[in-house]
Structure formats: structure tokens, C-alpha cells
């Protein structure tokens, strides 16, 4: 792999900071966007300074200043955006980035902020969670209308949110005595170590096999059921949990009285664990789809048994 100039937008976020690290480790000239408001957050600012110590370049720009964005993207070959999808307004900020990339005319690859379920497959998703997918599709359309070279990354379930707590609603720590199994617990799900997500993302930036395609992260040993995840934890911890199966109807009933953010989470879990939206389709090269672990077999990805060890 050669040396690229990579700009990460959202580099202080949950997945963004890992992508910055992976880019540096892979020897790329790494640039991190520094937005004015970042200087008001001591933790984010210190994180940016730590990137600088590791060799990254900090580039000042603002979504409210088009010319600053154009100057930033003119510095690089690749732009990776990882702004949070938790706030829908943040996703549409990417439209400003698309305009800057279009004007600059030099970017060879743009990876927008997705990294979860494939929004192209979620047109019938439940409200209010559907809004996230709809907005991601708005960004995709803008990218494609502008003929910007791109890769969409479907990274499925981050371990920190879905594995450590055995996908339970509430705390991010493992349950100590009881666990709710969604449905019969036998729907296949894809769980990912976040650092592996970053590694696969960086490996794709110069790969023509992923150009203008959707890359799914579906390493075979991480395609397991909810019940298998729970059983893995039980074997590691030596603690047998009391299991209660929850029907789809009862699960959806949990939405009642919840705030919007909680409803979004419940809706997304429903699609993952009851409908099997991460695995109920084949990856089809004819539809410009590729799978990461097949493209990069040299990556020693983290299995969920190993991911769970830190929780013991």
C-alpha cells in the first residue's frame, strides 16, 4: 500500500479516533479536521493534540465556512467522515463536505459517515429510527450526483455497544444474573471490534476493488446469534444467566412512553435481532457489493470470545 493523504472529519469521535490511529499506523499522511467548537471541549482538544504528537496534521475548518472546507480537502487524496449519526442534523452536515469536495476536484475517495446497517436496505425501517437511514441516503445521492469516488462501509454492530452488555437495553456492562433473549435468539448478527472497523476502513482507501461500492464487514467467525453470544459469555465467566425470551410484539411494546432516542434504539434492535437485517441477504458483486474479510484475509480480526475477555 502506498502513502495517501487522508483527512478524517469527526476524528475525536467513537470510531473517528480509531480511524485516525489506523491511518497513522498504516503510514499515511493523516490530517484531522479541527472545528472551532473543539477548542471548547478539553477532552476532544487534548485528543487532537495527542494525534499531533503521533504525527497527524490538524486542519482548521468549519462546516459554516465553505472556503475553509475547500482548503482542507484540497490538502488530501481521501476524505473519511465519521460525524455521529446519533444526531440527525450532524449527518446532513456532510452535504457541505460534498460541496467542498466537488469544488476542490482532487479527492480520489470519499467515505461518508455510515458504519452501521446499510441504509439502502432500510427503506421500510420503523420510525423514528428510519430518519437516520433516510438522511444517509440523502448524503449518498449527493455524493453520486456529484460523481465523487466513494466507498460505503457497513460495519454492523460495534462491540462496545452490542457485545459487552450482551445487547441488553441499559448499561453497557454484562448482566450479572438475568438476560433477555430477543425472539428465539437464533437470528444471525454481525459483531465487530471497533479497531478492526478502522483497519478495514483504511485498507479500502486505495483499493480499486472497493471503488464506488458498498463494503460489508462480515468476518465469518463474528457472524453469530444472540444466543451464541450469551453462551460465549457464560463459558468465559462461569456464570449461568437466567434467560427470558421476548417476543417481537412484546419487544416493540417497550417503545411506549420512551423518549425518541430510546425508541430509535429499540427500533434498530428490532431490525437486527428479529428481522435479521444484517445477514438476511447475500453480498452480491453484481450490485457493487464486497465483503471486507474476503478482500483482506491478512487482517487478524478480533473474535467476540476475545473481545469479551476485557469484561471479566
From Swiss-Prot:
Keyword Cytoplasm part of the UniProt annotation: no
Q: Which Gene3D superfamilies match?
A: NAD(P)-binding Rossmann-like Domain, UDP-galactose 4-epimerase, domain 1
Q: Which reaction does it catalyse?
A: (-)-lariciresinol + NADP(+) = (-)-pinoresinol + NADPH + H(+); (+)-secoisolariciresinol + NADP(+) = (-)-lariciresinol + NADPH + H(+)
Q: Where does the chain bind NADP(+)?
A: 10-16, 35, 44, 140
Gene Ontology MF terms in the entry: lariciresinol reductase activity; pinoresinol reductase activity
**EC identifiers of the protein:** 1.23.1.4, 1.23.1.3
Keywords of this protein's UniProt record, alphabetized?
NADP, Oxidoreductase
Tell me which SUPFAM superfamilies the record gives: NAD(P)-binding Rossmann-fold domains
Write down the superkingdom of origin.
Eukaryota
In what tissue types does this protein appear?
A: Expressed in seeds and roots, but not in stems. Detected in leaves.
Q: Which family does it belong to?
A: Belongs to the NmrA-type oxidoreductase family. Isoflavone reductase subfamily.
The annotated subunit structure for this chain is: Dimer.
Q: What does this protein do?
A: Reductase involved in lignan biosynthesis. Catalyzes the enantioselective conversion of (-)-pinoresinol into (-)-lariciresinol and of (-)-lariciresinol into (+)-secoisolariciresinol. Abstracts the 4R-hydride from the NADPH cofactor during catalysis.
Q: What is this protein called?
A: Bifunctional pinoresinol-lariciresinol reductase 1
